[in-house]
């Protein structure tokens, strides 16, 4: 009986990394950053491949801005999109995606252009 419990615990510990979800490691522009000029790119880095299914950039008035993405919806660990030139204001980036394990994820962050 004790052997079965130890064996089950060992299997659970070894399998845990296989079920871990991807996490967002970094974003550009940085969260709550204040920029002197429009950013050259909107980017995210993940610890495991992620298929970004939606990325949106809006200003404080809810107006949408186009983002040109170059990944073709392929799973990536580094995602980047090029925004049009942004006028001064507050901006929100919202995204959603699907991790390699099928788990859906989403998030948002803000930045300001002076």
Task: Briefly describe each language-model feature range.
Residues 7-9, 26:
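Short helix-onset patch at the extreme N-terminus, typifying the N->h transition
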